Amino acid sequence: MKFDKINNKGQAQLFENKFLEALTKGSPQLSWGIHLPILIFCFYYGYKNYQMPLGTMFMVFFGAIFFWTFFEYIAHRYIFHLISENPKLQRFAYIMHGNHHHYPRDRQRLFMPPVPSLIIVAALFGIFYLVMREYAFAFYPGFVLGWLMYASMHYMIHAMAPPFKFMKPLWRNHHLHHYKDETLGFGVSNTFWDKVFGTMFDLKKEKEDKETVSYTHLRAHETL
């Protein structure tokens, strides 16, 4: 689809039910406050109860952070930008990510809301534990910390100017994704995988159009 104009002010209404609508909003403080203590406890529990070497745990932990960057790219490209003729999938795509492209500066929807995020990370821990057993207690904290850092970077990109000059390419890459071509520039916390998979913008040549944006999600944002 193509939005005739994106809205740099305002907020999409996803549900008519006020309770459900409230569950679609979050903040950096809520996300860090909820998840960071869980990550610390999880890592400590794994260390104390499984007696894994601390060096091994940190290798798994930092490996998980790197794996998050790959997951971030794949999820953004193939799940958040899902294209389908199915109305339910269209609706899912708009709730998950399409509303953010429609209202990119809505700060209340730059972080995943607390309730959905807790459900998702609990399911992820279960999957990690089934696959890697005790190593999940190091992998899970690294993976979720990667998500928190990504979400914080995403929030900063939409809420403020880059604090350091070397970070400007990240800002430009994501702004081009929103305001120029949403089929490129899927990396948010980094551009490594965009370079690997050939979806990197030429930052020296491209200029974003802040009034219109090509967006291939099918329109399905009517409220329930």
Whereabouts are the PLM-identified features?
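Cytosolic-side membrane-entry/anchor segment at the start of a transmembrane helix
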Residues: 1-36
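Hydrophobic alpha-helical transmembrane segments
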Residues: 2-12, 55-68, 85-92
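Membrane-embedded catalytic scaffold of the fatty acid hydroxylase/desaturase
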Residues: 77-212
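Long, highly hydrophobic alpha-helical transmembrane signal-anchor segments
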Residues: 23-61, 119-129
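Conserved small/polar residues in nucleotide/adenosyl-binding loops
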Residues: 216-224
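Membrane-embedded alpha-helical segments that form the functional core of polytopic membrane enzymes
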Residues: 54-74, 84, 139-149
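Residue-level micro-sites within transmembrane alpha helices that shape
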Residues: 34, 68-71, 75, 100, ...
